[in-house]
Amino acid sequence: MVLSDLDIKEPDSPESGLNGSDDMVREHETESKGNLYSQYEEKVRPCIDLIDSLRALGVEQDLALPAIAVIGDQSSGKSSVLEALSGVALPRGSGIVTRCPLVLRLKKLEKEGEWKGKVSFLDREIEISDASQVEKEISEAQIAIAGEGMGISHELISLEVSSPHVPDLTLIDLPGITRVAVGNQPHDIEYQIKSLIRKYILRQETINLVVVPANVDIATTEALRMAQDVDPQGDRTIGILTKPDLVDKGTEDKVVDVVRNLVFHLKKGYMIVKCRGQQEIQHRLSLDKALQRERIFFEDHTHFRDLLEEGRATIPCLAERLTNELIMHICKTLPLLENQIKETHQRITEELQKYGKDIPEEESEKMFSLIEKIDTFNKEIISTIEGEEHVGQYDSRLFTKVRAEFCKWSAVVEKNFEKGHEAIRKEIKQFENRYRGRELPGFVNYKTFEIIIKKQVIVLEEPAVDMLHTVTDIIRNTFTEVSGKHFSEFFNLHRTAKSKIEDIRLEQENEAEKSIRLHFQMEQLVYCQDQVYRRALQQVREKEAEEEKKKKSNHYYQSEDSEPSTAEIFQHLMAYHQEVSTRISSHIPLIIQFFVLRTYGEQLKKSMLQLLQDKDQYDWLLKERTDTRDKRKFLKERLERLSRARQRLAKFPG
């Protein structure tokens, strides 16, 4: 939809008669005007009202809303353009005039509506009933925020103007770009200003309005270059040429080429306006009169009159264009905004769940609250020790980590017993030489067999205890993480849970270590069921016979020179190794699972439930971290804003 000049300003000057003065024309104008306002109310106003309502809800604290940012080099005419659009005078002077971002919210009223304004900053609101007060209030607001000097601030100043003579727009006036610090300005003033500007123009929800004097080389304009950096295709950038009356004679055609988008291309193109000059301001020329003079200037200008006819010139045409651009931009960004609100709502909901519910005031309610928290914690502990807990995509369950340690233990046992035949035979020969008694050659010395077995088993005791400590640490850390997950916001409860986790760990680890060492003491009693041992021995002998057969088939085979007793001891050792390795590699993990996994978890569960017996401790246990209550309140407020915003968007007819 396209808005006309009538939506912006109703001139009462003689020039208004240029459109016809007879009664038929006036009647037609009145009818057209009524139809236009009807269309405006039906199509344009709902879009503006939607964004205004979201802004009133405070959604801007969470997400960027569609707006227009006005940028330009220092003294490019930014403030003059904003004055002409808003109908109010803004601070002027040399150096940096705009020292804080100024959010100018213009709201068009019906013809009978009265002008009103409001300045908001630093949690202050100042109602204004006279447009002449605006300049003074904005200046005082800037001093209150940025101080008396020439520094700038990121703190926003909001100016709301409601009037029948303004377009529906949201404009953000940003400080003019300066390159050299003067006077008491900070030495890095250029960097500060550019950082502030970039913060706004980076947002995809922002239309960048770049103000450039018509009498300068547009290619050298810093503001246009910054806009191009963040919007290379010019999809959301509009160029505004000012001061056309200062253009050197003979260069007018170049200005026309720029406005017609033939020099520095922008998809949204350019407009050209003529605002009040310094002399006109000193002579107190009203903004209404300035608009009339602007139109006459373009109508009478040989080169620029065509731009007026094309709708590319004057403040009213600019206001119409900006309103339409903002409406189109709102419609374009609404789906994205809706998705952002939905995603943010979901994220805040999940974050709020981490902080739980508010702590109740009633004692009975406190007990139920504590029961709920401890019960949830205990359920996850039990799920964890049973290997059924929920984990992230890149995390592993506790039992998976523990099983990995058990697999390492099995490999250690295998490696210990799978020594090479020569090494074992050498060891047997050494024992024969040292411990052989009065036996004749060929008799097996059972003592030699026992000593070798005991020696090979006992060396596994300390590795078994080391594995116990490793597994216990893994389990203790996991239980502590579960405590942090459920109790992190209640430091006394979390500290109590960690204390119990540590105490029970120490107790269960000691019990497990005693059992492990007891098991290795029992393994010093060389024993195996007869039928089991006979079966193992038979398997070893069959295997050796098969290997001997393969060796004899080899042409280069040479018989090993060994005593029959040595060979027999070797076979017995291998048979017993087979059984004892199976026993140790399985039984030690069973001991660890029983004491430092299952019993550990069950004891922790019982110990946490015992906390419910002392009602005097409820307040202490449920005491929250200092910032938790404030954080929960903050998240609830955000969630409420976003919920209401989703409702508004759902009802929007667009």
Swiss-Prot record:
Residues 274-277 are annotated as: G5 motif. Signal peptide: none annotated. The modification N-acetylmethionine is found at M1. ISGylated. Residues 72-79 are annotated as: G1 motif. One of its GO terms (cellular component) is plasma membrane. It is found in: Cytoplasm; Endoplasmic reticulum membrane; Cytoplasm, Perinuclear region. Residues 1-33, 544-563 are annotated as: Disordered. GO terms for biological process: defense response to virus; innate immune response; receptor internalization; synaptic vesicle budding from presynaptic endocytic zone membrane. Residues 97-99 are annotated as: G2 motif. GTP binds at residues 72-79, 173-177, 242-245. Its main location: cytoplasm. Residues 1-12, 23-32 have a biased composition (Basic and acidic residues). Residues 62-335 form the Dynamin-type G domain. Residues 362-624 are annotated as: Stalk. Residues 173-176 are annotated as: G3 motif. Induction: By type I and type III interferons. Keywords: Acetylation, Cytoplasm, Endoplasmic reticulum, GTP-binding, Immunity, Innate immunity, Membrane, Nucleotide-binding, Ubl conjugation. It is a peripheral membrane protein. PROSITE patterns: G_DYNAMIN_1, G_DYNAMIN_2, GED. Residues 549-552 are annotated as: Critical for lipid-binding. One of its GO terms (molecular function) is GTP binding. Homooligomer. Oligomerizes into multimeric filamentous or ring-like structures by virtue of its stalk domain. Oligomerization is critical for GTPase activity, protein stability, and recognition of viral target structures. Interacts with TRPC1, TRPC3, TRPC4, TRPC5, TRPC6 and TRPC7. Interacts with HSPA5. Interacts with DDX39A and DDX39B. Interacts with TUBB/TUBB5. The C-terminal GTPase effector domain (GED) is involved in oligomerization and viral target recognition. The middle domain mediates self-assembly and oligomerization. This is Interferon-induced GTP-binding protein Mx1. It comes from Ovis aries (Sheep). The lineage of its organism: Eukaryota, Metazoa, Chordata, Craniata, Vertebrata. The gene is MX1.
